[in-house]
From Swiss-Prot:
Protein's gene: prfA
Broad class of the protein's primary localization: cytoplasm
Identification of the protein by name: Peptide chain release factor 1
Region of interest: Disordered: 285-313
NCBIfam families attached to this UniProt entry: prfA, PRK00591.1
Family classification: Belongs to the prokaryotic/mitochondrial release factor family.
Native source species: Salmonella paratyphi A (strain AKU_12601)
SMART domains xrefs: PCRF
Post-translational modification: Methylated by PrmC. Methylation increases the termination efficiency of RF1.
Pfam family, one: PCRF
Keywords, in A-Z order: Cytoplasm, Methylation, Protein biosynthesis
Modification N5-methylglutamine, positions: Q235
InterPro entries: PCRF (IPR005139), Pep_chain_release_fac_I (IPR000352), Pep_chain_release_fac_I_sf (IPR045853), Prokaryotic/Mito_RF (IPR050057), RF-1 (IPR004373)
Functional note: Peptide chain release factor 1 directs the termination of translation in response to the peptide chain termination codons UAG and UAA.
Gene3D superfamilies noted in UniProt: 3.30.160.20, 3.30.70.1660, 6.10.140.1950
């Protein structure tokens, strides 16, 4: 391992021990904000510190085994120990490199999930419903909370658009690679000839920002309309003009919220989604500029991004970004998404490591 990396790891290990000592200080325990901040830092440094301690121990083992090579009686055993220690050292070095990768500050945050029906009419709306159910099942398995912010139902089921807030540990970091185009190939229930149709939906995942970090929005840049919402088939969701539509004039971003009976609550929800959308648009623009020379696995939520194809007749799901195909569609639609999410997270880490090596 490079001396510069070892020096960085030593500094992080020392900081971990320093923070541990500070957390036992009565003055810091009394200051809850400081105590919480240090507790978070301690948790973030723990894996690096533990892994580095293991690596240091293995270096000692390598040194001891090399010294034993000079003893004819111990040589065979020393060679075996040396081989095992070097293998372990390589594994730990790879782990440490991943742990040193720059962290996305948004990864630990809650997220807004938007699913929109694209091309394909009623079938696209039905598939949007299937996708939302898939994500809800995944959230349920991870003990995350799903709160619907706004929805527009399809005429024959599913959704034209649905927005939900998902709350829990590391939601955005886990779901952020879902942003982009999702395509379905299947025989619609209304198809009498048994022909396979292709429909599409777009998914956008955005971090929920604390109030202090929301972009400054000039009230003069907003057009706010109130209306009475009604569900599919004319069923009234509510019977007062409490539904809110906010248009951000400079960007053209439109957010509707009609889930609550209170206009005030709908407006607050719509503004939080609007802030997240503006932030996401700014972030995507910045990332596009930064990553223009290498691929960006993080979809923009634009329909031109083709993330996955879900082929029902073949029971196949394909992630086009990493050329991964699995014949486990039923499990996928039931929310077993880790088998698709984990490979793309690993690919993203590999890209970051490659970029880091180029810089060095």
């Amino acid at each position: 391992m490079k001396p510069s990396i070892v020096a960085k790891l030593e500094a992080l290990h020392e900081r971990h021990e320093e923070v541990q000592a500070l957390l036992g200080d009565a003055g810091i325990i009394a200051d809850q904000d400081r105590f919480r901040a240090l507790s978070r830092e301690y948790a973030q440094l723990s894996d690096v510190s533990r892994c580095f301690t293991d690596w240091q121990q293995v270096q000692d083992d390598i040194e001891t085994a090399q010294m034993m090579l000079d003893d004819p009686e111990m040589r065979e055993m020393a060679q075996e120990e040396l081989r095992e220690a070097k293998e372990k050292s390589e594994q730990l070095e790879q782990q440490l490199q991943v742990l040193l990768l720059p962290k996305d500050p948004d990864d630990e945050r809650n997220a807004f999930l938007e699913v929109r029906a694209g091309t394909g009419g009623d079938e696209a709306a039905l598939f949007a419903g299937d996708l939302f159910r898939m994500y809800s099942r995944y959230a349920e398995a991870r003990r995350w909370r799903v709160e619907i912010m706004s929805m527009s139902e399809g005429e024959h089921g599913g959704y034209k658009e649905i927005i939900a807030k998902i709350s829990g540990d590391g939601v955005y970091g886990r779901l952020k690679f879902e942003s982009g185009g999702h395509r379905v190939q299947r025989v619609p229930a209304t198809e009498s000839q048994g022909r396979i149709h292709t429909s599409a939906c777009t998914v956008a995942v955005m971090p929920e920002l604390p109030e202090a970090e929301l972009p400054d929005i000039n009230p003069a840049d907003l057009r706010i309309d109130t209306f009475r919402s009604s569900g599919a088939g004319g069923q009234h969701v509510n019977t007062t003009d409490s539904s809110i539509r906010i248009t951000h004039l400079p960007t053209g971003i439109v957010v509707e919220c009609q889930d609550e009976r209170s206009q005030h609550k709908n407006k607050a929800k719509a503004l939080s989604v609007l802030g997240a959308r503006i932030h996401a648009a700014e972030t995507a623009k910045r990332q596009q500029a930064e990553a223009s020379t290498r691929r960006n696995l993080l979809g923009s939520g634009d329909r031109s991004d083709r993330n996955r194809t879900y082929n029902f007749p073949q029971g196949r799901v394909t992630d086009h970004r990493i050329n991964l195909t699995l014949y486990r569609l039923d499990e996928t639609m039931e929310g077993k998404l880790d088998m698709l999410i984990e490979p793309i997270v690993q690919e993203h880490q590999a890209d970051l490591l490659a970029a880091l090596s180029e810089q060095e």
